[in-house]
Protein backbone atom coordinates (compact mmCIF):
# COMPACT_ATOMS: atom_id res chain seq x y z
CA UNK A 1 0.00 0.00 0.00
CA UNK A 2 1.34 3.47 -0.82
CA UNK A 3 2.63 5.23 2.28
CA UNK A 4 3.03 8.93 3.01
CA UNK A 5 5.95 9.61 0.60
CA UNK A 6 4.16 7.94 -2.31
CA UNK A 7 0.92 9.84 -1.67
CA UNK A 8 2.78 13.14 -1.26
CA UNK A 9 4.61 12.46 -4.54
CA UNK A 10 1.26 11.92 -6.26
CA UNK A 11 -0.13 15.12 -4.72
CA UNK A 12 2.81 17.14 -6.04
CA UNK A 13 2.36 15.61 -9.49
CA UNK A 14 -1.35 16.43 -9.61
CA UNK A 15 -1.10 19.90 -8.10
CA UNK A 16 0.04 21.81 -11.23
CA UNK A 17 -2.84 20.51 -13.37
CA UNK A 18 -5.56 20.44 -10.70
CA UNK A 19 -5.17 23.50 -8.50
CA UNK A 20 -6.99 26.49 -9.96
CA UNK A 21 -8.44 24.37 -12.78
CA UNK A 22 -12.07 23.44 -13.35
CA UNK A 23 -13.33 19.87 -13.63
CA UNK A 24 -15.00 20.19 -17.03
CA UNK A 25 -16.35 16.64 -16.78
CA UNK A 26 -15.87 13.62 -14.55
CA UNK A 27 -16.32 9.96 -15.44
CA UNK A 28 -16.88 7.07 -13.03
CA UNK A 29 -16.60 4.07 -15.34
CA UNK A 30 -17.94 1.54 -12.86
CA UNK A 31 -20.30 1.66 -9.91
CA UNK A 32 -17.75 1.05 -7.21
CA UNK A 33 -14.16 0.73 -6.10
CA UNK A 34 -13.65 -0.35 -2.49
CA UNK A 35 -16.99 1.32 -1.78
CA UNK A 36 -19.85 2.26 -4.14
CA UNK A 37 -19.61 5.71 -5.69
CA UNK A 38 -22.20 8.18 -4.48
CA UNK A 39 -25.15 8.19 -6.93
CA UNK A 40 -24.45 11.76 -8.09
CA UNK A 41 -20.64 11.53 -7.83
CA UNK A 42 -19.73 12.67 -11.37
CA UNK A 43 -22.49 15.28 -11.56
CA UNK A 44 -21.44 16.94 -8.29
CA UNK A 45 -17.86 17.31 -9.54
CA UNK A 46 -18.70 18.72 -12.97
CA UNK A 47 -18.00 22.44 -13.21
CA UNK A 48 -16.22 22.65 -9.85
CA UNK A 49 -12.91 24.48 -9.53
CA UNK A 50 -10.22 22.79 -7.46
CA UNK A 51 -9.17 25.48 -5.00
CA UNK A 52 -6.43 23.41 -3.40
CA UNK A 53 -5.05 19.88 -3.25
CA UNK A 54 -3.91 18.69 0.16
CA UNK A 55 -2.88 15.50 1.89
CA UNK A 56 -3.80 14.05 5.26
CA UNK A 57 -1.81 10.92 6.13
CA UNK A 58 -2.37 8.62 3.11
CA UNK A 59 -5.41 10.52 1.81
CA UNK A 60 -5.66 13.22 -0.85
CA UNK A 61 -8.18 16.03 -0.38
CA UNK A 62 -9.28 18.28 -3.25
CA UNK A 63 -10.96 21.44 -1.96
CA UNK A 64 -13.80 22.35 -4.36
CA UNK A 65 -15.45 25.69 -5.12
CA UNK A 66 -18.83 24.21 -4.11
CA UNK A 67 -17.70 23.94 -0.49
CA UNK A 68 -17.24 20.19 -0.80
CA UNK A 69 -14.04 18.18 -0.55
CA UNK A 70 -13.15 15.22 -2.76
CA UNK A 71 -11.52 12.60 -0.52
CA UNK A 72 -9.31 10.12 -2.40
CA UNK A 73 -7.37 7.03 -1.29
CA UNK A 74 -5.07 5.01 -3.54
CA UNK A 75 -5.74 1.67 -1.84
CA UNK A 76 -3.29 -1.14 -2.61
CA UNK A 77 -2.70 -0.63 -6.33
CA UNK A 78 -4.20 2.72 -7.28
CA UNK A 79 -2.28 5.32 -9.27
CA UNK A 80 -3.01 8.59 -11.05
CA UNK A 81 -1.75 9.42 -14.51
CA UNK A 82 -1.75 12.91 -15.97
CA UNK A 83 -2.33 12.89 -19.73
CA UNK A 84 -1.86 16.22 -21.46
CA UNK A 85 -3.40 17.00 -24.82
CA UNK A 86 -0.08 16.72 -26.65
CA UNK A 87 0.72 13.57 -24.61
CA UNK A 88 4.42 14.44 -24.79
CA UNK A 89 6.65 13.06 -22.06
CA UNK A 90 10.30 13.27 -21.18
CA UNK A 91 10.95 9.94 -19.45
CA UNK A 92 13.25 10.00 -16.45
CA UNK A 93 15.92 7.46 -15.62
CA UNK A 94 13.45 5.12 -13.93
CA UNK A 95 10.55 5.68 -16.35
CA UNK A 96 8.17 2.76 -16.73
CA UNK A 97 5.98 3.07 -19.83
CA UNK A 98 2.40 2.21 -18.93
CA UNK A 99 0.49 0.09 -21.41
CA UNK A 100 -2.46 1.36 -23.40
CA UNK A 101 -4.92 -1.13 -21.84
CA UNK A 102 -7.44 1.04 -20.03
CA UNK A 103 -9.53 -1.74 -18.49
CA UNK A 104 -8.51 -0.59 -14.99
CA UNK A 105 -8.94 3.14 -15.68
CA UNK A 106 -11.94 3.60 -13.42
CA UNK A 107 -12.16 7.38 -12.94
CA UNK A 108 -11.24 10.21 -15.31
CA UNK A 109 -11.25 13.95 -14.60
CA UNK A 110 -11.21 16.19 -17.68
CA UNK A 111 -9.63 19.45 -16.51
CA UNK A 112 -9.83 22.96 -17.93
CA UNK A 113 -6.02 22.98 -17.73
CA UNK A 114 -6.05 20.73 -20.79
CA UNK A 115 -5.11 17.60 -18.86
CA UNK A 116 -7.00 14.39 -18.29
CA UNK A 117 -6.37 12.86 -14.87
CA UNK A 118 -6.87 9.10 -14.94
CA UNK A 119 -7.21 6.92 -11.83
CA UNK A 120 -6.13 3.34 -12.51
CA UNK A 121 -6.74 0.68 -9.84
CA UNK A 122 -6.46 -3.01 -10.82
CA UNK A 123 -7.31 -4.35 -7.35
CA UNK A 124 -9.99 -1.73 -6.64
CA UNK A 125 -9.07 -1.11 -2.99
CA UNK A 126 -8.96 2.64 -3.55
CA UNK A 127 -11.95 4.91 -3.09
CA UNK A 128 -13.29 8.40 -3.72
CA UNK A 129 -15.92 10.20 -1.71
CA UNK A 130 -17.37 13.72 -1.71
CA UNK A 131 -17.84 15.24 1.75
CA UNK A 132 -18.75 18.69 3.01
CA UNK A 133 -15.87 20.88 4.11
CA UNK A 134 -17.40 21.09 7.57
CA UNK A 135 -17.56 17.29 7.82
CA UNK A 136 -13.81 16.68 7.58
CA UNK A 137 -13.23 16.43 11.33
CA UNK A 138 -16.12 13.96 11.66
CA UNK A 139 -15.22 11.88 8.61
CA UNK A 140 -14.63 8.28 9.85
CA UNK A 141 -11.48 7.84 7.74
CA UNK A 142 -9.89 11.02 9.11
CA UNK A 143 -11.22 11.79 12.58
CA UNK A 144 -8.91 9.50 14.59
CA UNK A 145 -5.68 10.22 12.73
CA UNK A 146 -2.66 11.31 14.75
CA UNK A 147 -0.28 14.16 13.90
CA UNK A 148 1.47 14.48 10.56
CA UNK A 149 5.07 13.24 10.97
CA UNK A 150 6.38 16.12 8.84
CA UNK A 151 4.23 18.73 10.58
CA UNK A 152 5.66 21.32 12.95
CA UNK A 153 3.74 19.89 15.90
CA UNK A 154 5.33 16.43 15.62
CA UNK A 155 8.38 16.33 17.87
CA UNK A 156 9.99 14.10 20.48
CA UNK A 157 7.77 15.43 23.27
CA UNK A 158 4.59 14.66 21.33
CA UNK A 159 5.77 11.15 20.40
CA UNK A 160 6.84 10.43 23.98
CA UNK A 161 3.45 11.54 25.30
CA UNK A 162 1.64 9.33 22.79
CA UNK A 163 3.76 6.30 23.71
CA UNK A 164 3.99 6.79 27.48
CA UNK A 165 2.66 3.76 29.30
CA UNK A 166 2.11 1.73 26.12
CA UNK A 167 2.87 -1.96 26.50
CA UNK A 168 3.02 -2.55 22.77
CA UNK A 169 6.19 -2.77 20.68
CA UNK A 170 7.75 0.36 19.24
CA UNK A 171 7.04 -0.77 15.70
CA UNK A 172 3.38 -1.49 16.43
CA UNK A 173 3.01 1.95 18.03
CA UNK A 174 4.47 3.71 14.98
CA UNK A 175 2.10 1.83 12.66
CA UNK A 176 -0.87 2.91 14.77
CA UNK A 177 -2.35 5.78 12.75
CA UNK A 178 -3.70 7.32 15.96
CA UNK A 179 -0.12 7.79 17.23
CA UNK A 180 1.33 9.23 14.03
CA UNK A 181 -0.41 9.42 10.66
CA UNK A 182 0.86 8.13 7.34
CA UNK A 183 3.68 5.80 8.37
CA UNK A 184 3.68 2.28 6.97
CA UNK A 185 5.82 -0.83 7.18
CA UNK A 186 8.62 0.28 4.87
CA UNK A 187 9.38 3.63 6.46
CA UNK A 188 8.94 2.41 10.03
CA UNK A 189 11.56 -0.30 9.41
CA UNK A 190 13.89 2.25 7.83
CA UNK A 191 13.43 4.87 10.56
CA UNK A 192 13.98 2.38 13.38
CA UNK A 193 17.20 1.25 11.72
CA UNK A 194 18.51 4.80 11.39
CA UNK A 195 17.67 5.48 15.03
CA UNK A 196 19.35 2.17 16.03
CA UNK A 197 16.22 1.11 17.92
CA UNK A 198 14.85 -2.41 18.02
CA UNK A 199 11.35 -2.90 16.57
CA UNK A 200 10.71 -5.13 19.60
CA UNK A 201 11.54 -2.39 22.10
CA UNK A 202 8.62 -1.28 24.27
CA UNK A 203 7.05 1.93 23.00
CA UNK A 204 6.89 3.20 26.58
CA UNK A 205 10.69 3.52 26.65
CA UNK A 206 10.39 6.69 24.56
CA UNK A 207 9.24 8.50 27.71
CA UNK A 208 10.79 8.89 31.16
CA UNK A 209 8.76 8.16 34.28
CA UNK A 210 7.82 11.82 34.29
CA UNK A 211 6.59 11.55 30.70
CA UNK A 212 9.46 13.51 29.20
CA UNK A 213 11.07 12.41 25.91
CA UNK A 214 14.12 10.19 26.12
CA UNK A 215 17.14 10.30 23.86
CA UNK A 216 15.54 7.41 21.97
CA UNK A 217 12.50 9.56 21.17
CA UNK A 218 14.64 12.41 19.88
CA UNK A 219 16.72 10.09 17.67
CA UNK A 220 13.60 8.42 16.31
CA UNK A 221 11.85 11.66 15.36
CA UNK A 222 14.99 12.84 13.56
CA UNK A 223 15.16 9.51 11.71
CA UNK A 224 11.48 9.66 10.71
CA UNK A 225 11.93 13.18 9.34
CA UNK A 226 15.06 12.20 7.39
CA UNK A 227 13.63 9.01 5.88
CA UNK A 228 10.36 10.60 4.79
CA UNK A 229 12.00 13.66 3.26
CA UNK A 230 14.54 11.56 1.37
CA UNK A 231 11.80 9.25 0.09
CA UNK A 232 9.70 12.18 -1.13
CA UNK A 233 12.70 13.64 -2.97
CA UNK A 234 13.20 10.23 -4.60
CA UNK A 235 9.58 10.03 -5.74
CA UNK A 236 8.66 7.33 -3.22
CA UNK A 237 9.34 3.60 -3.42
CA UNK A 238 8.16 1.52 -6.39
CA UNK A 239 7.93 -2.10 -5.31
CA UNK A 240 4.77 -3.20 -7.12
CA UNK A 241 2.27 -0.63 -8.30
CA UNK A 242 3.47 2.85 -7.33
CA UNK A 243 4.09 5.21 -10.22
CA UNK A 244 4.45 8.96 -10.24
CA UNK A 245 1.79 10.84 -12.20
CA UNK A 246 4.13 10.95 -15.22
CA UNK A 247 4.41 7.16 -15.21
CA UNK A 248 7.92 7.40 -13.78
CA UNK A 249 8.99 5.02 -11.04
CA UNK A 250 9.94 6.19 -7.60
CA UNK A 251 13.45 5.06 -6.71
CA UNK A 252 13.84 5.25 -2.92
CA UNK A 253 13.87 1.42 -2.92
CA UNK A 254 17.46 1.72 -4.13
CA UNK A 255 18.28 3.42 -0.81
CA UNK A 256 16.72 0.84 1.53
CA UNK A 257 19.02 0.09 4.45
CA UNK A 258 17.10 -2.89 5.85
CA UNK A 259 13.72 -3.29 4.16
CA UNK A 260 13.65 -6.33 1.84
CA UNK A 261 17.38 -6.96 2.50
CA UNK A 262 17.12 -10.17 4.54
CA UNK A 263 20.47 -11.97 4.76
CA UNK A 264 22.50 -9.02 3.47
CA UNK A 265 25.21 -7.21 5.47
CA UNK A 266 24.21 -4.36 7.76
CA UNK A 267 25.22 -1.02 6.28
CA UNK A 268 26.16 0.57 9.60
CA UNK A 269 29.91 1.24 9.59
CA UNK A 270 31.76 -1.27 11.74
CA UNK A 271 28.63 -3.26 12.68
CA UNK A 272 29.33 -6.54 10.90
CA UNK A 273 25.77 -7.73 11.49
CA UNK A 274 23.31 -9.24 9.03
CA UNK A 275 19.80 -8.00 8.25
CA UNK A 276 17.16 -10.33 9.65
CA UNK A 277 13.44 -10.68 9.02
CA UNK A 278 10.68 -11.80 11.35
CA UNK A 279 6.89 -11.55 11.30
CA UNK A 280 5.51 -8.98 13.72
CA UNK A 281 1.77 -8.32 13.98
CA UNK A 282 1.28 -10.05 10.65
CA UNK A 283 3.90 -8.01 8.78
CA UNK A 284 7.52 -8.62 7.84
CA UNK A 285 9.94 -6.67 9.99
CA UNK A 286 13.49 -6.12 8.70
CA UNK A 287 16.21 -5.10 11.14
CA UNK A 288 19.78 -5.61 12.32
CA UNK A 289 19.73 -7.35 15.72
CA UNK A 290 23.34 -6.34 16.32
CA UNK A 291 23.04 -2.55 16.13
CA UNK A 292 19.34 -1.99 16.83
CA UNK A 293 18.70 -2.15 20.58
From Swiss-Prot:
<keyword id="KW-0479">Metal-binding</keyword>
<feature type="active site" description="Proton donor; for beta-elimination activity">
    <location>
        <position position="58"/>
    </location>
</feature>
<dbReference type="InterPro" id="IPR000214">
    <property type="entry name" value="Znf_DNA_glyclase/AP_lyase"/>
</dbReference>
<dbReference type="InterPro" id="IPR010663">
    <property type="entry name" value="Znf_FPG/IleRS"/>
</dbReference>
<dbReference type="Pfam" id="PF06831">
    <property type="entry name" value="H2TH"/>
</dbReference>
<dbReference type="InterPro" id="IPR015887">
    <property type="entry name" value="DNA_glyclase_Znf_dom_DNA_BS"/>
</dbReference>
<feature type="binding site">
    <location>
        <position position="123"/>
    </location>
    <ligand>
        <name>DNA</name>
    </ligand>
</feature>
<feature type="zinc finger region" description="FPG-type">
    <location>
        <begin position="257"/>
        <end position="293"/>
    </location>
</feature>
<dbReference type="InterPro" id="IPR020629">
    <property type="entry name" value="Formamido-pyr_DNA_Glyclase"/>
</dbReference>
<keyword id="KW-0378">Hydrolase</keyword>
<dbReference type="GO" id="GO:0034039">
    <property type="term" value="F:8-oxo-7,8-dihydroguanine DNA N-glycosylase activity"/>
</dbReference>
<dbReference type="Pfam" id="PF06827">
    <property type="entry name" value="zf-FPG_IleRS"/>
</dbReference>
<keyword id="KW-0234">DNA repair</keyword>
<comment type="subunit">
    <text>Monomer.</text>
</comment>
<protein>
    <recommendedName>
        <fullName>Formamidopyrimidine-DNA glycosylase</fullName>
        <ecNumber>3.2.2.23</ecNumber>
        <ecNumber>4.2.99.18</ecNumber>
    </recommendedName>
</protein>
<keyword id="KW-0238">DNA-binding</keyword>
<comment type="similarity">
    <text>Belongs to the FPG family.</text>
</comment>
<feature type="binding site">
    <location>
        <position position="166"/>
    </location>
    <ligand>
        <name>DNA</name>
    </ligand>
</feature>
<keyword id="KW-0862">Zinc</keyword>
<dbReference type="GO" id="GO:0006284">
    <property type="term" value="P:base-excision repair"/>
</dbReference>
<feature type="active site" description="Proton donor; for delta-elimination activity">
    <location>
        <position position="283"/>
    </location>
</feature>
<keyword id="KW-0326">Glycosidase</keyword>
<feature type="active site" description="Proton donor">
    <location>
        <position position="3"/>
    </location>
</feature>
<dbReference type="InterPro" id="IPR010979">
    <property type="entry name" value="Ribosomal_uS13-like_H2TH"/>
</dbReference>
<dbReference type="GO" id="GO:0140078">
    <property type="term" value="F:class I DNA-(apurinic or apyrimidinic site) endonuclease activity"/>
</dbReference>
<keyword id="KW-0511">Multifunctional enzyme</keyword>
<keyword id="KW-0227">DNA damage</keyword>
<dbReference type="GO" id="GO:0008270">
    <property type="term" value="F:zinc ion binding"/>
</dbReference>
<feature type="active site" description="Schiff-base intermediate with DNA">
    <location>
        <position position="2"/>
    </location>
</feature>
<dbReference type="InterPro" id="IPR015886">
    <property type="entry name" value="DNA_glyclase/AP_lyase_DNA-bd"/>
</dbReference>
<keyword id="KW-0863">Zinc-finger</keyword>
<keyword id="KW-0456">Lyase</keyword>
<dbReference type="InterPro" id="IPR012319">
    <property type="entry name" value="FPG_cat"/>
</dbReference>
<dbReference type="GO" id="GO:0003684">
    <property type="term" value="F:damaged DNA binding"/>
</dbReference>
<dbReference type="Pfam" id="PF01149">
    <property type="entry name" value="Fapy_DNA_glyco"/>
</dbReference>
<feature type="binding site">
    <location>
        <position position="104"/>
    </location>
    <ligand>
        <name>DNA</name>
    </ligand>
</feature>
<dbReference type="InterPro" id="IPR035937">
    <property type="entry name" value="MutM-like_N-ter"/>
</dbReference>
<comment type="function">
    <text>Involved in base excision repair of DNA damaged by oxidation or by mutagenic agents. Acts as a DNA glycosylase that recognizes and removes damaged bases. Has a preference for oxidized purines, such as 7,8-dihydro-8-oxoguanine (8-oxoG). Has AP (apurinic/apyrimidinic) lyase activity and introduces nicks in the DNA strand. Cleaves the DNA backbone by beta-delta elimination to generate a single-strand break at the site of the removed base with both 3'- and 5'-phosphates.</text>
</comment>
Amino acid sequence: MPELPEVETVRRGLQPVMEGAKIVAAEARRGDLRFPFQPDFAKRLQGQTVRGLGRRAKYLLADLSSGDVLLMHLGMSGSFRVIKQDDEETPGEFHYPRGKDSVHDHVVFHMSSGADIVFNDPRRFGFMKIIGRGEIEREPHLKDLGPEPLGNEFDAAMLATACAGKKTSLKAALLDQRVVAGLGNIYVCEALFRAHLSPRRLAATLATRKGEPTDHARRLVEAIHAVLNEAIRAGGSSLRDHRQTSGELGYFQHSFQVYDREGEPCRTDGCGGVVKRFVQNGRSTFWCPKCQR
